């Protein structure tokens, strides 16, 4: 009989989808095992016969499915306002250029976010965070990028820090100051990049407000030379980097990111084979964002077969934002990734667990159920992991465990 220590907690009578690639079964499934949790981490996975059937801190899950906590590795969670009226205009035939000329597009969100005080901005973001937590998310990336000036970018990152301090969900904050050119720099995007590189990145990094730097390398964002200035600045300070690349066109952003050992290349609908090979060589995760693909009614799909062939890890995320993916649901993104991009349910599960953890630099502690990893996991009223992907309108979450505590 396995000896338990005071304070140990056990989950028994479970079907365990570990997502551990070292296990041979699909999803890393094991049966007739129990989880021992100690001090917020997974202490061990042992045969049920080695443990008492009942006792203090022993939870009988009656055969329910247990998976790692979900990880949403790409969100724009902190913003004010919405773009519903603009979406209706687009559906009625208005062009993006026409909407932008009227003050719409990303700068509409920037204006609303700049004008919003920190407390109401926090309350808006907190409600969104809790929606994701209710789906089983235990680690969440939050980007800035709707300030495009030092004060508001800092405000967005302070909101992310306040959310993290609630200890309800892990937050990975990202500085996305190079998201778009603000209206006041419309005729001087290089000048804006200078502001980002010489002021925003070093000052906000010194304050400890973010974990990584992101950018938007695209024809409607920043060109390759401007993007490389951002990457050079970040790398000189030892800051991990990532990027929105190859979403609307092929500029070579994925190859650029990979030269800087980017954590992830996100969107990647127009990614080519040279970019895929560079991502493999640079250890860069491909993050698929099917919500934006759907909402923008795009036609160019990411090169999933190439990513498989080159064995590039693929993550899936919600990309929750007001302009191109207003879906605060990782479950929906999981389903869309299967239906629209052709991922298998097992690939999607890897994409919201171990590969998503890698996209955030957390692969040594998150995204799998194995000894030594954080005790972040979800108990589902389900028998198979595919059930959560198959029916996105139904949430079979039974219990969410964060840092070893039922939450």
From Swiss-Prot:
Fe(3+) binds at residues 74, 76, 244, 319. It catalyses: 4-imidazolone-5-propanoate + H2O = N-formimidoyl-L-glutamate. Pfam families: Amidohydro_1 (PF01979). Zn(2+) binds at residues 74, 76, 244, 319. Keywords: Cytoplasm, Histidine metabolism, Hydrolase, Iron, Metal-binding, Zinc. One of its GO terms (molecular function) is zinc ion binding. Its EC number is 3.5.2.7. It is found in: Cytoplasm. HAMAP family: HutI. This is Imidazolonepropionase.
